[in-house]
Amino acid sequence: MTRWVPTKREEKYGVAFYNYDARGADELSLQIGDTVHILETYEGWYRGYTLRKKSKKGIFPASYIHLKEAIVEGKGQHETVIPGDLPLIQEVTTTLREWSTIWRQLYVQDNREMFRSVRHMIYDLIEWRSQILSGTLPQDELKELKKKVTAKIDYGNRILDLDLVVRDEDGNILDPELTSTISLFRAHEVASKQVEERLQEEKSQKQNMDINRQAKFAATPSLALFVNLKNVVCKIGEDAEVLMSLYDPMESKFISENYLVRWSSSGLPKDIDRLHNLRAVFTDLGSKDLKREKISFVCQIVRVGRMELRDSNTRKLTSGLRRPFGVAVMDVTDIINGKVDDEDKQHFIPFQAVAGENDFLQTVINKVIAAKEVNHKGQGLWVTLKLLPGDIHQIRKEFPHLVDRTTAVARKTGFPEIIMPGDVRNDIYVTLVQGDFDKGSKTTAKNVEVTVSVYDEDGKRLEHVIFPGAGDEAISEYKSVIYYQVKQPRWFETLKVAIPIEDVNRSHLRFTFRHRSSQDSKDKSEKIFALAFVKLMRYDGTTLRDGEHDLIVYKAEAKKLEDAATYLSLPSTKGELEEKGHSATGKGMQSLGSCTISKDSFQISTLVCSTKLTQNVDLLGLLKWRSNTNLLQQNLRQLMKVDGGEVVKFLQDTLDALFNIMMENSESETFDTLVFDALVFIIGLIADRKFQHFNPVLETYIKKHFSATLAYTKLTKVLRTYVASAEKPGVNEQLYKAIKALEYIFKFIVRSRVLFNQLYENKGEADFVESLLQLFRSINDMMSSLSELTVRVKGAALKYLPTIVNDVKLVFDPKELSKMFTEFILNVPAGLLTVQKLSCLIEIVHSDLFTQHDCREILLPMMTDQLKYHLERQEELEACCQLLSNILEVLYRKDVGPTQRHVQIIMETLLRTVNRTVISMGRDSELIGNFVACMTAILRQMEDYHYAHLIKTFGKMRTDVVDFLMETFIMFKNLIGKNVYPFDWVIMNTMQNKVFLRAINQYADMLNKRFLDQANFELQLWNNYFHLAVAFLTQESLQLENFSSAKRAKILNKYGDMRRQIGFEIRDMWYNLGQHKIKFIPEMVGPILEMTLIPETELRKATLPIFFDMMQCEFHSTRSFQMFENEIITKLDHEVEGGRGDEQYKVLFDKILLEHCRKHKYLAKTGETFVKLVVRLMERLLDYRTIMHDENKDNRMSCTVNVLNFYKEIEREEMYIRYLYKLCDLHKECDNYTEAAYTLLLHAKLLKWSEDVCAAHLTQRDGFQATTQGQLKEQLYQEIIHYFDKGKMWEEAIALGKELAEQYETEMFDYEQLSELLKKQAQFYENIVKVIRPKPDYFAVGYYGQGFPSFLRGKVFIYRGKEYERREDFEARLLTQFPNAEKMKTTSPPGDDIKTSPGQYIQCFTVKPKLDLPPRFHRPVSEQIVSFYRVNEVQRFEYSRPIRKGEKNPDNEFANMWIERTIYTTAYKLPGILRWFEVKSVFMVEISPLENAIETMQLTNDKISSMVQQHLDDPGLPINPLSMLLNGIVDPAVMGGFANYEKAFFTDRYLQEHPEAHGQIEKLKDLIAWQIPFLAEGIRIHGDKVTEALRPFHERMEACFKQLKEKVEKQYGVRTMPSGLDDRRGSRPRSMVRSFTMPSSSRPLSVASVSSFSSDSTPSRPGSDGFALEPLLPKKMHSRSQDKLDKDDPDKEKKDKKKEKRNSKHQEIFDKEFKPADSSLQQSEAVILSETISPLRPQRPKSQVINVIGNERRFSVSPASPSSQQTPPPVTPRAKLSFSIQPSLELNGMMGMDVADVPPPLPLKGNMADYGNLMENQDMMVSPTSPPPPPPQRQQPPPLPSKTPPPPPPKTTRKQTSVDSGIVQ
């Protein structure tokens, strides 16, 4: 038989690629993407578990799994699989899983914005993950992508409030175990800052991007402007040159080279290949350019063709002339400043044409800049622009998509701010400025064209050395723009001349001038008419000076002018001419040789950008020092005045010169100081930011080119001389510069010595060492000087001396150097230069010196002493912290030799100081995190040996140890309670916890060893220990159950559950206390309780017995455990409410403590009682907590009452009051003012009218300012009366008012308050009589099924409805609270199947309150007074339903109609502190048909009497309800009137069968007889008030009544009305003592309805226009008459629509479900709840008018106009309706509405709690949802294996067991 076999190594790990639904208990469901650990395999099936839920193992088809590589570790039980993916891929995968869960939650919460953000991030990560997995990316792109991925993960984690991930520089997650604490802290800081910056960018993308970009660009030394020319829209008509450049409008000068594009006449670039690739980058922009007030991007368009465009005969015209056409200008200041950035935006730059010949291009540019707008007529350029950071090399690397090899590079004219060493240039920028040319023999001014070319001294032209613009080829001669007939043209055209360096000294620029004619024939004959030139090298060997040059214009024959020999010997500028003694301003021509100086003038300006040629004579003199040694001293001094840019260009040559001077004068000291100063000057230059990139050049020079072997002696000597003379005023400044250059001076000294040693094998070693020692001693002596002059130098020494360490130790003993440094620091005068001193120490720690063990031995004690000194004085904390951090960082390293002793030094000197610094620091200090990291690092680096040694360091002073431990415990507790690090720094916090845990355990050992015995016991110390340990254990960051499973697994894997570790330690420490335990009771009960409540089972089991131990301790001491009991009850309440504790804790508490108690001789009984008490309390508290955040306030109230009743029962007054106020607040939120008043009354009852002082717990609220119980009681009464008033419970308010009035009158004598109170009471009495109060309905609700919480399950409650709340609304409200509950259809008690089912079943029906009148009202009293007690102060409620007994009588159905009446008694009267109370007893009675008839008759009589009384009291009442009532009774058409009773009960047969009923029959007859006088009075009143329109109706009624009266008086005798009925106050006859509902209540009294018979009758509709009595008819008749009405009513359809709007959707469904076809009354015996519980009144009473219709005397109902507010409720009288014969009038408590009532006004709606009905969008809740969209088409699932596998193997063999329990990380 085949069986399951363990999988091979390559089959251990896989991913599900299709969903699989388990089909049996053994199978495992899979979702796409689930990773599985596969343990066994069998013919196409696998067995294992998903990594999501490792606890559930099962089988699944192998075809659904894609196997992946994984590393398998361990075997059998300990087998784990680790995916073989890249770490980053694993991180992305886990991140996606974590985010997807949150993403789903965001969807559920409808957080759309965040949902979309997360979706984008998830898509990005999935995309990038695929790219990385594809393995196709080149290394640099992969590196970039990794950066993007990690940045996205970190950003996403932050916005989702997940943990911060810390990484190394390569983006890999840091392993905290291998990283020092300080590095970890710094990594967190960096990560946090980066994420914060990203968040800021995202938050206000535009604004912050501007700021960040500006900051980024400001920090970049070099910038470039990228320009992409998209199109030139200009009507030129000929070829053109488009010249683009940057321009400074303030200085009116161009600041960059031109970018030149040649444009053809066809409107396209001449080089068609570059059609969509016209890109240029303007480089070398720097910070100075950012500071320019304005920068413009200028485009000049030069037409190349004819002189005049309008000339049409092109063949005869000269072509190829450069003519000005126009300009386009755009302000790019914001782009260059980084304020605007949009590389995709195309900018349109409007074109301005040249207006006339005198309109020079430069002038037009300035005009356009000054103008507000340009009339461009649609002409202009389209460009995109973007600012890029970096020089050209960086840009090409970082923006290859923008800048490639084809992109033109236009440099800045001049050097960039930072000259890069490899940037070799030899560019001369020549600008043609202007000229002034005489017209000569011509009648008009000439059309002058200047041609520029470069010639050597032999007259040979240099080819291709002129560059008109970037993006264009080099040319040999440049022709200027021609201005037509302009005498003084101004060109401002710049070109670049680039000549090989060797040709410069032989070359000159030549400018020739020629008149150009527009006619081709004339033009050819025009020769050069003049010439100007300028040499590029001056006579002294320097290059042409920058700036303007006024050139001499020579005239001669054209041929002569072409010969260089003719003019080269002549002066080229007017300045030279003057030097030679000639006048440069002569008006006439002067002849020089064969050339004549013309009076024409011509100016150019030049700018030399050369790294090889200098314009500086002094520098040249130094470089060529051998040619004239006499000037050497002067040259050396002058060097220091030369511009830095010139020096760095010739750095190597200059240094060579200096050291050559030094070496060639080795015997004398003449030049030593000067050379030293020059060297210092050069080193100082390179330190400047502008030349910082020359540092590598200097380093390279020292390493490779420097060769002065004896320089060290001279340099050391000069430096020592300077230091020794530090206090001399003249020397001080030079010494300061020298010390700033110390690093490189020592590099030269050391390199020189090393070279010397290589040549002479360590010769003169001792002398060299001695000279260095003397130098260091001089420096140290200088440090101790107190002179003011030396302060700046000493500061510089502290800053720069550490820079020499790494070089000096190559040629000098490091230990000696360490001693020197120690002395150096110790010599700094106290209180001076503290920051500089600490910075110096920081640099020393960074140096190689500190990594050497021997050197550290010397340096560390000095450093720790310095730190201690400054920390104790709270000086320069930031520097101290940085220094300590760096020291600890070095000591953590494994490559720095032994560190144990050094950690000890730090511990001894600094641990306590650092602790105290942390304690004294505010949480808001920026440094608190750094110091805590330092303290954690010290503790982490301490070994057990260190802890043991720590105590010894305190010596014999016991108090020192106590103080130290006290400080530490308090500090730890504070840090744990209020962590200094953000919550998302999980790794840092966990590392800190791990370190603290070890330290706490180490300190606990000290407690046990030194402070436990009787003599040395320290109570406070132990107390602090326990509080700290519990605080540690209960801190948020250790509660693993709150984390995701992945995070929990990671923490457990790396650190274990630290709560367990410390919990067991606390337990052991407690038991160690022995006889001292009693000192900790009750103080330690709370902390121990906190610990036991942690949801960790093993910890609970281990620590719960401590409670029994505490009980035992207290019992042995006091023979009771009262203190313990009080404390645990108080604390338990706070803890459970705060979220701790669960069902399991309750069970464990019960089990463990009972076990212990039962074993104890004395505690068995009392202990058990206590345990049961706590368990009961816990049940209630857990219920309360579960429901506390529930939207359902009713449940919250129930639980609150359960808890407060429990506290009352166990006499915990303080807790009882606390929960009273919670209940009161809930009531106020719901506007339940009556209940709020009753709740507060419970508090008031606890107080006496006395001067006793209030206990603290009695004044629970800030609102009550009372010192005595009497004061507090008075304040409470005032508030309660206020609430009763708001709840319209004036009777209750009056009762309290009387009690309070007595106090005011007889005790307090506060007549002012008494008067106010009595006024209120008077108002209350008036309200009782005059204000109509809506009467609430009462509903019985049963909760059945195990799905309900314990406080509801299996119980029945009576609910008091809200004002105007119908049963449907109440039911809907109930079902929204329990959406999963099923509504029961019957009112009969449910069976056990329902009670024990796991679901939820709700039974709800209306009950009638049973009146319980106070004794004082058992006499005739006004109905307005009595009506209050019908629905208030009630404790018993009844529900009636009809049942049949005996045979059915088709002629008279009343004879065997019995009523089953159920009486419910609640725990308390309603209303009370809740709007519902539990039913405590249920009693059922059956009422015979005869008794039912008596009740019905009695009610009818009461009804008539009441209405008559009301009309007597208030003659203004409307007559319609009275009409309906009387007509319904007297009209003989009603089914024979009370003839049904006569048929049923007044027969001989009935008397024979029921002889005992004789008295009841007589009573019924008496009631029938009594009806006549009431009716007579009613008809009399009706006759008085009837209108003429209704007179016929009244007369018919009178006729009917006459017949009725005759019959009744004949059969049953005559009754006369008591005389009291006329009394306006309305005293009532005895028969009316059973009072009836006020009509205003809109609610009936009896509790069953005839409709209960039939299962088909429809419940009354919420908006029904019919009168409320209507449903009391048997259904069949009702329906028919209704149908008839419907036919007669043409507006019915409209009305129905209105009704629909008012109806709740819920009711519509209800109606549909229970509305089958009409059927007979007898159809069904089953009682359907929907029938028995219909609330027979409209949602809001709606007034209607009655119209008489023809002779039929039938009444229809028409809707009232909105103004008819005072008309009575709707009424539909029918001929068939009668009160007297309905046997079931009191069934279901739904007696017809008292028609005479005017309904009370609806209350103002304060909040949603006012109405119980659903909100308006209820339609959405039940409307049928649209069908879901079809699922996306996917491929078919993989085929399942044909064989069904056997069940998984039983765990028999060891092998199988081991396979089973594999674990996956």
Curated annotation (Swiss-Prot):
Q: Does the keyword DNA repair apply?
A: no
GO MF assignments: guanyl-nucleotide exchange factor activity; SH3 domain binding
Region Interaction with NCK2 (minor): start-end pairs: 1837-1852
Q: Where is the C2 DOCK-type domain?
A: 425-609
Q: What is its main location?
A: cytoplasm
Region Disordered, annotated ranges: 1613-1723, 1753-1778, 1801-1865
* Segments forming domain SH3: 9-70
Which PROSITE patterns is this protein grouped with? C2_DOCK, DOCKER, SH3
Residues that the record marks as modified (Phosphoserine) are S1681, S1743, S1756, S1761, S1764, S1858
Which keywords does the record carry? Apoptosis, Cytoplasm, Guanine-nucleotide releasing factor, Membrane, Phagocytosis, Phosphoprotein, SH3 domain, SH3-binding
| Top-level taxonomic group | Eukaryota
The entry's localization annotation reads:
Cytoplasm; Membrane
Give the comment on domains.
The DOCKER domain is necessary and sufficient for the GEF activity.
Q: What is this protein called?
A: Dedicator of cytokinesis protein 1
Organism source for this protein? Mus musculus
